[in-house]
């Protein structure tokens, strides 16, 4: 009887340990995925840093206070893009939302860029990322050619 009880206790302990281990693994994945955008600039295996840095150089020469019409910040983000990011976050059941003032933050601007790429560019196409940043999701190749070449020339 006592051997059987010990076996049952051991099984119970193993099950509890397995559940705890799984919870820790899930928690660590969530922590890594939910970090600051500048620390986690990769979406899947794509490193968007060179693209974002080149876009920043073309859009504002690195000036986070740049203003041109409705576009502001280092990445020249429009209110429409902020709205699109918030729609994506809502669809993902996230409580996070971007404000219009977030456009002046380079880190928040990069977060918005990454969110747009993850949602609208899951194939991680650099060309699509650059052209759509300039011409919108339904960009025209002809209309975005000059911009695309400019950004590509700034990439390191």
Annotate each language-model stretch with its function:
Residues 20-28:
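Bacterial N-terminal signal peptides
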Residues 29-33:
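Sec/Tat signal peptide C-region and signal peptidase I cleavage site
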Residues 1-2, 20, 109:
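Solvent-exposed, charged interface segments at domain starts and junctions
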């Amino acid at each position: 009887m006592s051997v059987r009880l010990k076996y049952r206790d051991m099984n119970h302990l193993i099950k509890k340990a397995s559940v705890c281990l799984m919870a820790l693994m899930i928690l660590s994945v969530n922590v890594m995925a939910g970090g600051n955008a500048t620390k986690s600039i990769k979406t899947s295996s794509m490193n968007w840093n060179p693209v974002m840095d080149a876009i920043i150089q073309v859009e504002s020469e690195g000036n986070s206070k740049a203003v041109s019409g409705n576009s502001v910040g280092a990445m020249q983000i429009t209110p429409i893009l902020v709205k699109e990011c918030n729609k994506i976050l809502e669809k993902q059941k996230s409580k996070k939302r971007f404000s219009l003032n977030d456009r002046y933050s380079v880190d928040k601007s990069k977060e918005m860029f990454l969110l747009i790429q993850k949602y609208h560019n899951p194939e991680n196409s650099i060309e699509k990322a650059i052209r759509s940043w300039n011409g919108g999701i339904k960009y025209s190749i002809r209309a975005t050619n000059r911009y695309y070449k400019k950004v590509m020339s700034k990439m390191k």
